[in-house]
């Protein structure tokens, strides 16, 4: 499925979402690997199979097998880490912050692609999943690696757009009879 075909599934009440998707698709401010890895990782984070299939198909033409796998890995690891570290952050009992996580996450240290790209994908997924601790950690690593604030903002903007595409498509699938006027 192409971006155009995905746009056709977005209902008229979400015209702004369609326009944002078009803008995202034509944005060239990130490297192709960073951009299309974001498409994959963020689409997976939406848990919407239509969006995931479409954006993975688009990205496959621009990513190596290793980069495609790394983007999927970022989404999977953040699904775990975002739940755990959001709990640690939000729990009133701060004892949990002193306990070892005991979660395997070796791929973060050796993702098989440029570390900054993997961190960018992880940051964007963490934004979708709402983990402030993870957002701060990934943003700090990205800044230390010399990634600009504009690139970081672009990644989070892509995450917001991809999430809104998933929600718009899901909302269009729900039909409720309207009360007679």
From Swiss-Prot:
SUPFAM superfamilies: AhpD-like (SSF69118). Its EC number is 1.11.1.28. InterPro entries: AhpD, AhpD-like, AhpD_core, CMD-like. GO terms for biological process: cell redox homeostasis; response to oxidative stress. It comes from the Bacteria. Pfam families: CMD. Disulfide bonds join 131-134. One of its GO terms (molecular function) is peroxiredoxin activity. It is an enzyme of class 1 (oxidoreductase). It catalyses: N(6)-[(R)-dihydrolipoyl]-L-lysyl-[lipoyl-carrier protein] + a hydroperoxide = N(6)-[(R)-lipoyl]-L-lysyl-[lipoyl-carrier protein] + an alcohol + H2O. The active site is at 131 (proton donor), 134 (cysteine sulfenic acid (-soh) intermediate). The keyword Nucleotide-binding does not apply. Keywords: Antioxidant, Disulfide bond, Oxidoreductase, Peroxidase, Redox-active center. The keyword Magnesium does not apply. Belongs to the AhpD family. Antioxidant protein with alkyl hydroperoxidase activity. Required for the reduction of the AhpC active site cysteine residues and for the regeneration of the AhpC enzyme activity. PANTHER family: ALKYL HYDROPEROXIDE REDUCTASE AHPD (PTHR33930:SF7). This is Alkyl hydroperoxide reductase AhpD. It comes from Bradyrhizobium sp. (strain BTAi1 / ATCC BAA-1182). The gene is ahpD.
